[in-house]
């Protein structure tokens, strides 16, 4: 497990305190307003008036206001973690097995628990509950550690979801499709990030640094979920148009094959581009290596 120095911990604590102060200061007039009305339209009216009178606000405060205004039109579908990226544990797993699984596979503080298939999520556990149970030598199954989640549709507005999470006192929502199957996942952190900006933990920082790396003039390593436009800008070549039904590099690859390709598969995208699958599951692409036969910008 990674350990941070006292100096790093102090720096993080100061940053968190500054963020908390900023949010409290900014939301004070909003909180007071909601004591008088529950109308969403009036809520955004308050936000807009705050933005107009934002000359004395800091950059962080103005950014939060801008994010709040954008929240008016955003739905769960815009931010949810897709089904293929959900980390979950079977209900039949015992506590010792779960402890090892979380250490090796699941870098999050909360983990979904399902019965049979991912379409039957029964709740989630918090890692602190797990380690507390292990420390007190509790044995058995997971049921006594499971916390409740809520169910939401992809079309639900983010502000409505935030209010529902607060009412239900839970931090996780399972997004279901029209047939009741699990479509995705949204956490309270996802919603907060939409308002105050991205909140990175150590795992996020590792993923971000590996998302898109230009190794040399002819090789790029990329997360399959990086947008195609990022690659187009780097190589100076158009790879898709407005009529294509994909946005990511992984989507680009899948248009050339009939199923998710195995690790090691190489696919010619154009005369200059070959993409090799370097990480994948049976359901989705994770990472690819992009080879530029003519080098960057044909050099």
Curated annotation (Swiss-Prot):
Database matches in Pfam families: CBS (PF00571), CorC_HlyC (PF03471)
Q: Name one GO molecular function term.
A: flavin adenine dinucleotide binding
Q: Which PROSITE patterns match?
A: CBS
Question: Boundaries of each CBS domain copy?
Answer: 80-142, 145-202
Q: Which UniProt keywords apply?
A: CBS domain, Repeat
Q: Which family does it belong to?
A: Belongs to the UPF0053 family. Hemolysin C subfamily.
Further details from the record: Despite the presence of the tlyC gene, the true SFG rickettsiae are non-hemolytic.
Recorded protein name is Hemolysin C homolog
Species for this entry: Rickettsia rickettsii (strain Sheila Smith)
